[in-house]
Regions:
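Short active-site oxyanion
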Residues: 44-48, 83-85, 195
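Beta-loop-alpha module in the N-terminal Rossmann-like domain of NAD(P)-dependent dehydrogenases
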Residues: 55, 63-127
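Rossmann-fold dehydrogenase core element
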Residues: 123-141, 160-167
Length: 259
């Protein structure tokens, strides 16, 4: 059986997502001998690290067996040895970056959300389809052990008719007090294309779609939890205070059990 290498450029390789999730996963696949295909061949990923900071890229590349790295996106997209462009960079500008990769004939795999608007997301998907390249978006939560077990139980009708579902989904994001912030500001700042709704709803949407069924409608209220929110203006600092707490209550008339 043949062994084939496939070049994958990771845009945003030194960020938290690029390093701790995606690069680590690719290196694990490499150490296991690559991905076994249905034909019996093995596909070996060859990561190429891309970012803005040469020093960080060099350190990360050395720590992973002297991988190739670059700060030149155009050069990477022009490299015939690279077949896949993966974007783990800031959400803002992702359609432009991915669109350039599609135009260069690269398959694209993107962190979610793939765009800030539905129109931009659909346009990107259609451009990839017209170009004849593969396009994909992260849906890693589907493969978590707990959710795969949930799906098995659902398929066997273990739950019977499901009347209501509650999902608590998230993790701690520190603001620098008292613990250091561990998420880049573009991930949560609306001004830079971020936000909890845009970032997190994309996760649970594919979970429900793939595990339980199609979503017919969504109702959402978004609020900022930190009590003090500042917005700088040329003359002064504008302070806004939010004193209300957010309370989640889910009443229903479906019995928990039969008595």
């Amino acid at each position: 059986m043949a062994t084939r290498n496939i070049g994958i450029v990771i845009d945003g390789a030194t960020g938290r997502l690029g390093t701790t999730q995606h690069l680590r996963s690719l290196m694990t696949i490499r150490s296991e001998g690559g991905l076994l295909l249905a034909s019996g061949d093995r596909l070996i990923p060859e990561p190429v690290l891309m970012g803005r900071d040469p020093a960080k890229l060099a350190v990360l590349a050395a720590a992973n067996g002297d991988l190739k790295w670059s700060t030149d996106r155009d050069a990477c997209l022009a490299d015939p040895a690279i077949a896949i462009y993966f974007d783990a960079n800031a959400t803002g500008g992702r359609p432009v970056r991915a669109g350039a990769a599609v135009a260069a004939g690269k398959h694209v795999y993107l962190e979610k959300p793939i765009a800030e608007t539905l129109e931009d997301a659909l346009d990107l998907a259609r451009r990839a389809e017209r170009a004849g390249v593969k396009s994909g978006v992260v849906q890693d939560k589907l493969f978590l052990p707990g959710l795969t077990k949930l799906r098995k139980l659902y398929d066997t009708d273990f739950f019977g008719r499901i009347l209501s579902v509650r999902l608590d989904f998230g993790w701690w994001v520190f603001d620098g007090t008292p613990y250091p912030a561990q998420r880049p500001s573009w991930n949560y700042r609306k001004a830079t294309g971020g936000g909890l709704v845009l970032d997190m709803f994309a996760h649970w949407r594919y979970i429900f779609d793939r595990l339980l069924g199609e979503i017919k409608s969504v109702s959402c209220r978004h609020m900022t939890a930190p009590p003090e929110c500042r917005r700088r203006v040329p003359a002064a600092s504008d302070r806004r205070w939010c004193s209300a707490a957010c309370i989640g209550c889910g009443p229903n008339w479906s019995p928990r059990s039969s008595f």
